[in-house]
Amino acid sequence: MRTLWIMAVLLVGVDGSLVQLWKMIFQETGKEAAKNYGLYGCNCGVGRRGKPKDATDSCCYVHKCCYKKVTGCNPKMDSYSYSWKNKAIVCGEKNPPCLKQVCECDKAVAICLRENLGTYNKKYTIYPKPFCKKADTC
């Protein structure tokens, strides 16, 4: 029951590219993003930061660093266009430069998570934030 409540809280106020990110993750990994990665390790999910626990968590760390480089839009809220062609993510060419960057960040993390499915460890699925050690800066 606690897990369902946490997932409901994560979904409240979700908009824009966050929904697109979750869709990309599902397309690449076959895993429901909020359920499997919403509180994974120290870096997956909103407001989480710390030394990565494994390669899966490292994907999220790199994604946060990618978002930090984006200027001119809100990576978590502003929508962009992309398509799924021949089992590949294709960011829309008509996206403004900022949203093109956001799409590429999201595409990279989705692919990284797929490439590291073998490192996914259920013990990190709902990992307590206090157990995370300070991470290096991006």
Curated annotation (Swiss-Prot):
Cross-referenced PROSITE patterns: PA2_ASP, PA2_HIS
Family (UniProt): Belongs to the phospholipase A2 family. Group II subfamily. K49 sub-subfamily.
Subunit structure, as described in the record: Exists as a monomer in both solution and crystal states. In the presence of SDS or probably in the presence of phospholipids, assembles to form SDS-resistant stable oligomers.
Entry protein name: Basic phospholipase A2 BP-II
Cofactor(s) this protein cannot do without: Ca(2+)
A GO biological-process term: lipid catabolic process
Main location (coarse class): secreted
Something else known: Is abundantly expressed in Tokunoshima and Amami-Oshima P.flavoviridis venom, but is missing in Okinawa P.flavoviridis venom. It is thought that loss of BP-II in Okinawa P.flavoviridis is due to lack of necessity for a strong toxicity exerted by BP-II in the venom as far as they feed mostly on frogs.
Matches recorded under CDD domains: PLA2c
A cellular component term, taken from the record's GO annotations: extracellular region
Role description: Snake venom phospholipase A2 (PLA2) that shows anticoagulant activities, strong myolytic activity, infiltration of polymorphonuclear cells, and edema in stromal tissues. Induces cell death of Jurkat cells in a concentration-dependent manner. Shows a low phospholipase A2 activity. PLA2 catalyzes the calcium-dependent hydrolysis of the 2-acyl groups in 3-sn-phosphoglycerides.
